[in-house]
Amino acid sequence: MYQVVASDLDGTLLSPDHTLSPYAKEPLKLLTARGINFVFATGRHHVDVGQIRDNLEIKSYMITSNGARVHDLDGNLIFAHNLDRDIASDLFGVVNDNPDIITNVYRDDEWFMNRHRPEEMRFFKEAVFKYALYEPGLLEPEGVSKVFFTCDSHEQLLPLEQAINARWGDRVNVSFSTLTCLEVMAGGVSKGHALEAVAKKLGYSLKDCIAFGDGMNDAEMLSMAGKGCIMGSAHQRLKDLHPELEVIGTNADDAVPHYLRKLYLS
């Protein structure tokens, strides 16, 4: 039996409308009441995820910003790995002139965007988290957990992914959380490495963990955990990268809570 359950949120545990269904909430409460450790493992910001956790009324670790931040059961920050200042500063303005690509910055407790995009707020059904606008040359690049780029066209983000990797190499970890969202963290940052740290803190190892995800930002976590489950609606790139992993149903079908009920509660 896996003692640690780690799950991504968007595209995985959350419904397509970015909410937690009642069917999803119940097993999380039952699992944690039985002593199984649930871990949120997401690209979302810790301020946002903390509200989701509090609304659920469960104790859980939070891996946020794709592993750049880890908070304990009481919400205390126990791990932080920021982008180097020079990289963060350059990323703030790298596509500022492209009207099709929005630049987002997570810095400590704040979220910044380089221009308004009201539709981003559709992700915040379970929490209240608002962005502020920034000017690239005026934003202090200290404490930046990640910079991410959103665009309706995946094809426009592909050359940006290649350019960032070519420029900074292993000083960054670049991955697509969705086809329309390219995320940049410091080198060595991943949900998988953060999960390893959390498991160790709990007295377990990665082999005691089961993980669920749908994005390329879940790749390390899914492959490093004792059991990794890929969502049926996941990027094909992720399925191709890890053909050895089990593919389950979709978030529209509440596949993760179904799986957890069968594994732990039946």
Swiss-Prot record:
Q: Which positions in this protein are listed as binding Mg(2+)?
A: 8, 10, 214
Q: Which residues bind phosphate?
A: 9, 42-43, 191, 217
Kindly state which keywords UniProt assigns to this record, in alphabetical order: Hydrolase, Magnesium, Metal-binding
Q: Which residues form the active site?
A: 8
What Enzyme Commission number does this protein have? 3.1.3.74, 3.1.3.23
Reaction equations catalysed? pyridoxal 5'-phosphate + H2O = pyridoxal + phosphate; sugar phosphate + H2O = sugar + phosphate
Which top EC class applies here? hydrolase
Keyword check for Glycoprotein: no
**Cofactor notes:** Magnesium. Can also use other divalent metal cations as manganese, cobalt or zinc.
Coiled-coil positions: none
Q: Which NCBIfam families match?
A: Cof-subfamily, HAD-SF-IIB, PRK10976.1
Query: What role does this protein play?
Result: Catalyzes the dephosphorylation of pyridoxal-phosphate (PLP) and sugar phosphate.
Family classification: Belongs to the HAD-like hydrolase superfamily. Cof family.
- Annotated PANTHER family: PTHR47267, PYRIDOXAL PHOSPHATE PHOSPHATASE YIGL
What protein name does the entry list? Pyridoxal phosphate phosphatase YigL
Q: Which organism is it from?
A: Escherichia coli O157:H7
